[in-house]
Amino acid sequence: MKKIILVAGGTGGHFFPAVALGEELIKRGYIVHFITDLRCKKYINKDMKIIFYLLDLKRFSNILLFLPTLLIAFLKSIKLIYHIKSCVIIGFGGYPVIAPMFAAIFLRIPIIIHEQNSYLGKVNKFFARFAKKIAISYEDIKNVPEFAKSKIVLTGGIVRKNIRELDSFIYLASQHCPTKLTKTVLTNTLNHFVKARNNKFSNCNIFTLFIFGGSQGAKLFSELIPASIEILMKKQPNLELKIIQQASLAHQVKIKDIYSKLNITYEFAEFFDNIALQYKVANLVISRAGASTIEELTYIGLPTIFIPLPSAADNHQYYNAKLLADNKAGWCLEQNNISAEKLADQILDLISNRQLLEDAAQNLLNRKQEGHLLLSNLIEDTVFL
C-alpha cells in the first residue's frame, strides 16, 4: 500500500484539517503517517487510524536559539521519512512543518502545500518554490509570489468529520428561528425558504449566542463579552438570551455573577471537546477568525461576528474575516477598535433584523467546498497518475 505523510502542528487549526484529510486518504486505501509537534499531543485520539510521530520543535524569536533545534529536528525528520518511504508529503504551514519539509526536499520526495488562510503564510510562501502544487482555501488569496501562481489549485478548506455530519442551517427571518436543511433540500431550495422547523429550535423566543476564542485569545472575550451583554440587556431588557461561552475557570466565577444578575441562561467550558454540539444550538457565534473555525462555520452556514486575533502570524485572521465581511457572509470587528458598546450595538442589530442573519447564512453556504475530497483528488492526480 502507498504511504502518505501529513505534516501539521502548532494549533488545532492546523491539526484537525490535516486529520480530516488523513481520514479520507485512509478510506481510499493509503497508509497515512502524521508528523506533528508536542503541542498537538492532546488532540491525538487512540481511535484514529493515522500513525502519529511527535517532534520536539520549539519556536524561538532568537534565530540563534532556533537554528540548533531546527537542525536536530531536520536530522530526525530525514531518518524518519527515509524509513517510512512515503510517496508524497503534504504540509499545512506553520513553523512545525519546516524540518520535515526540508527533509522531504533533501530526500527528493514530492511536496504539496495546503494554505488554509486567505493570506499565504511565510512558511508556505518559502516552500512554494519546491511544491508540486499549492492547494488554497480562498480563490482571492493574497501574498502569492508570481512564480507560484501556476501551481495554485482551489480545493477549499477542510472540515472535520463531526462538523460535516451536521446539516446546514439557514435562517428564516419570518420565524426568527434557524431551520435545519438537509443537503438535498438545500440544493433544491437555495432560493426558497422551507417552513418546517426542527424540534431543537422549537423555542424560538430564546436567542442563543455561542462565544469562543479558540486555543488563543479567549481572555479578551471573558472581559469584553460580559460588558457588552450588560449594555445589550439595558437596551433590550425583555430579550430572552442564552449564552454558551468558552472561559477559563478563573474568569467563570465573575462572568456567572454578571449573567445571573441579568437573568441570562448560560453554559461555560474551558474547552469544547465536541464543538458540533454547540454549533447545533447557536443562532449567532462570536469568535476569533482562525482558518479552521471559518471553514466550519462556512460549511454549516452559521453567521458569526469575528474578532480577529491581532497577533496572529501575518495578520491572517484579519484577512480571513475581512474577506467574509466584504462578501456579506459575516461581520469583522477589529480588536484594537472594538468596545463593549460597539459589540452590543452589533449584536442588537442582528437580533432585531434576522434578515441579516439569513443573508449571511446563504452567503456562507454559497462558499462551501468539500475540501477533504478535492485535496485528496489533487494528491492522487499530481503524484499517482
UniProtKB/Swiss-Prot annotation:
It is an enzyme of class 2 (transferase). GO terms for cellular component: plasma membrane. InterPro entries: GlcNAc_MurG, Glyco_trans_28_C, GlycoTrans_28_N. It catalyses: di-trans,octa-cis-undecaprenyl diphospho-N-acetyl-alpha-D-muramoyl-L-alanyl-D-glutamyl-meso-2,6-diaminopimeloyl-D-alanyl-D-alanine + UDP-N-acetyl-alpha-D-glucosamine = di-trans,octa-cis-undecaprenyl diphospho-[N-acetyl-alpha-D-glucosaminyl-(1->4)]-N-acetyl-alpha-D-muramoyl-L-alanyl-D-glutamyl-meso-2,6-diaminopimeloyl-D-alanyl-D-alanine + UDP + H(+). GO terms for molecular function: UDP-N-acetyl-D-glucosamine:N-acetylmuramoyl-L-alanyl-D-glutamyl-meso-2,6-diaminopimelyl-D-alanyl-D-alanine-diphosphoundecaprenol 4-beta-N-acetylglucosaminlytransferase activity; undecaprenyldiphospho-muramoylpentapeptide beta-N-acetylglucosaminyltransferase activity. One of its GO terms (biological process) is lipid glycosylation. Keywords: Cell cycle, Cell division, Cell inner membrane, Cell membrane, Cell shape, Cell wall biogenesis/degradation, Glycosyltransferase, Membrane, Peptidoglycan synthesis, Transferase. It is a peripheral membrane protein. Cell wall formation. Catalyzes the transfer of a GlcNAc subunit on undecaprenyl-pyrophosphoryl-MurNAc-pentapeptide (lipid intermediate I) to form undecaprenyl-pyrophosphoryl-MurNAc-(pentapeptide)GlcNAc (lipid intermediate II). Belongs to the glycosyltransferase 28 family. MurG subfamily. HAMAP family: MurG. This is UDP-N-acetylglucosamine--N-acetylmuramyl-(pentapeptide) pyrophosphoryl-undecaprenol N-acetylglucosamine transferase. It comes from Rickettsia typhi (strain ATCC VR-144 / Wilmington). The gene is murG.
